[in-house]
A protein has these predicted regions:
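Catalytic helix-loop patch of NAD(P)-dependent Rossmann-fold dehydrogenases
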Residues: 40, 44-48, 68-109, 113-115
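NAD(P)-dependent short-chain dehydrogenase/reductase
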Residues: 97-147, 154, 160
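Mid/C-terminal beta-alpha module of Rossmann-like enzyme folds, strongest
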Residues: 158, 165-217
């Protein structure tokens, strides 16, 4: 989405009625260590897509993130004021502002920790935990980082609702369970019938970790602690059913 000429050509050829913008640098650590590139993709790319949607009279649905919030209380509602404290979060908020300014018809979907079987090679937390426990390795889940995890198919159902009928504004689509990563690891172990004793609790790291820390500590140290989304308003507006983590994990077994 950083090739503006190619983007324009695609819009001209396809003439889309609805565009769902998922493309982004979504890894927090990558955005922090390469801020210019993250801004180019996440902000400038989103702005250009928004402009082209207006030019070609297409609706835009943009996937944003709970990282637009500061992470100091959790269960954020749609009308809470963003206050990001990571570069990734700042780029997503800036993209939201650009889309609201440039697109004539837009919907923004903020979501939380997404899990499920990946189509591509990229793993997510649930599959990482499954792989570790199957290999007899431990998973250390911190007890101070809270999210509202959502199964990818449930997120897709919400986005599909926005594709089929136009609803302008900001929406929160996430799971019902506000839980820490240790609790999430336990849920994965129990649903998949794996050894839950391999799931170990660790305290959340306060602030940025020291230089030369292990990679997992560096990544964790860049993340806000207490996030998670309150989806009550969105579920009511769109007629969505909210699902628990256990429900989503069980669907992975089907």
């Amino acid at each position: 989405i950083t090739d503006h000429n190619r983007l324009d050509q695609i819009f001209l050829e396809v003439r889309p009625e609805v565009v769902v913008l998922l493309a982004a640098i979504a890894d927090v650590k990558t955005a922090e260590t390469g801020p210019e590139r993250a801004t180019e993709v996440n902000v400038d790319g989103a702005r250009q897509v928004a402009r082209l949607c207006t030019k070609y009279h297409a609706r835009l649905i943009f996937l944003s993130s709970e990282y637009v919030f500061g992470g100091n209380r959790g269960n954020y509602q749609e009308d809470d004021s963003p206050d990001p404290n990571t570069h990734y979060g700042r780029t997503k908020w800036q993209a939201e502002l650009a889309i609201a300014d440039e697109a004539s018809q837009w919907s923004i979907v903020r979501t939380s920790l997404v899990y499920g079987w990946p189509i591509t090679g990229r793993r997510n937390l649930a599959t990482v935990i499954v792989d570790r426990l199957k290999n007899g390795e431990s998973y250390e889940g911190d007890t101070g980082t809270y999210r509202t995890p959502i199964y990818v198919e449930h997120l897709t159902e919400g986005i599909t609702q926005l594709v089929t009928s136009y609803h302008p504004g900001i929406f929160h689509i996430a799971g019902t369970d506000w839980m820490n990563m240790y609790q999430f690891g336990h849920s994965v172990a129990e649903v998949f019938g794996l050894d839950s004793s391999l799931v170990k609790p660790i305290p959340v790291l306060a602030g940025l970790p020291p230089e030369n820390s292990p990679p997992e500590e560096v990544e964790q140290g860049l993340r806000p602690d207490i996030l998670g989304l309150d989806c009550t308003q969105t579920n009511h507006k769109l007629g969505l059913h909210a699902f628990s983590v256990v429900t989503g994990l069980k669907e992975m077994l089907v």
